[in-house]
């Protein structure tokens, strides 16, 4: 009897664990996307962390990291979306820009405003997404490639 109760308890915990992870985005998972320099802009490394939680309060989060960029510099990173065009062949819409300031070593980080579920209502499907970092003269200095992002 103790063995049956132990197995039942373990099965219940496993079910709870599976149910809680199933609420995360099944179509698009968290991804770290590399930022690459445009022309000769200095950059040791850079990335965008794109997180799709698909929660009732938070649909998505984004984090931005620069390492070895220009020191003590102001940048802005733009989220651009090619709506229903996962190849990024057509025109893009710029959804928002987020400021990033670097320290004396050229390192900086920032996060986008939380994206609520209602902001993506009606956009279910595949989209081409890329991120572009602009310097204070509004010139693109870093960018990602085209990422195929599926919203569900």
Please describe what each predicted stretch is.
Residues 14-22:
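C-terminal segment of classical bacterial N-terminal signal peptides
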Residues 24-152:
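N-terminal leader/targeting pre-sequences
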């Amino acid at each position: 009897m103790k063995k049956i109760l132990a197995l039942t308890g373990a099965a219940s915990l496993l079910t709870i664990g599976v149910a809680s992870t199933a609420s995360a985005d099944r179509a698009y998972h968290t991804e770290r996307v590399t930022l690459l320099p445009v022309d000769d802009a200095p950059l040791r490394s850079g990335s965008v962390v794109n997180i799709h939680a698909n929660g009732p309060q938070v649909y998505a989060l984004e984090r931005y990291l620069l390492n070895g960029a220009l020191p003590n510099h102001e940048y802005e990173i733009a989220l651009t979306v090619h709506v229903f065009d996962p190849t990024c062949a057509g025109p893009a819409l710029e959804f928002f820009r987020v400021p990033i300031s670097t320290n004396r070593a050229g390192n900086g980080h920032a996060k986008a405003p939380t994206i609520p579920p209602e902001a993506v209502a009606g956009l279910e499907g595949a989209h081409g997404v890329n991120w572009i970092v602009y310097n204070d003269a509004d010139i693109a200095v870093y960018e990602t490639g085209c990422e195929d992002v599926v919203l569900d």
